[in-house]
């Protein structure tokens, strides 16, 4: 990399929180399936509780449906983690005068490319509260703001400010929102 190129990697869905949620949903789904089968067969398949005492038609059947729903949700979560949806890079190239924003999508990669001269400012947005938002985005001429930071867990304020200031300094544009 030369001094005229800045490349930032963006973390996708391969985060610890996503792994923990997918594992919890998977374990819960297996638990519901075993409880449903215990109710149907009349034998305890779980090492705790006494699910064989459940009546199959209302309770066991509903637990079986919960296990199907959990299996579908867990499959989706593990697929999103395997594909690493949302990961990608932000590439700012002064030599060629191009900004390339690329992300991995569900079916195919998403790539946005536009001239460097269209960048008017770097915007740092901080909103605390119930629906907190902390992100760095590009203000573009004739387009809406283009977010650059990852989705999910908000970045620490110091890191957010540092990334925004570094990018604004590199591009030679104003930093807005602080």
UniProtKB/Swiss-Prot annotation:
What is the superkingdom listed in this entry's lineage?
Bacteria
Can you list the GO cellular component terms from the UniProt entry?
A: photosystem I; plasma membrane-derived thylakoid membrane
Q: Where are the membrane-spanning stretches?
A: 19-39, 61-81
Keywords tagged on the record: Membrane, Photosynthesis, Thylakoid, Transmembrane, Transmembrane helix
Q: Which residues form a coiled coil?
A: none
Where found? Cellular thylakoid membrane
Q: A Pfam family in this protein?
A: Ycf4
Q: Which residues does UniProt assign to the signal peptide? A: none
Q: Its GO biological process terms?
A: photosynthesis
Q: How does it sit in the membrane?
A: Multi-pass membrane protein
What is the annotated role of this protein in its UniProt record? Seems to be required for the assembly of the photosystem I complex.
- What protein family does this chain belong to? Belongs to the Ycf4 family.
Q: Under which name does UniProt file this protein?
A: Photosystem I assembly protein Ycf4
**Species per Swiss-Prot/TrEMBL record:** Synechococcus sp. (strain CC9902)
Please state the gene responsible for encoding this protein: ycf4
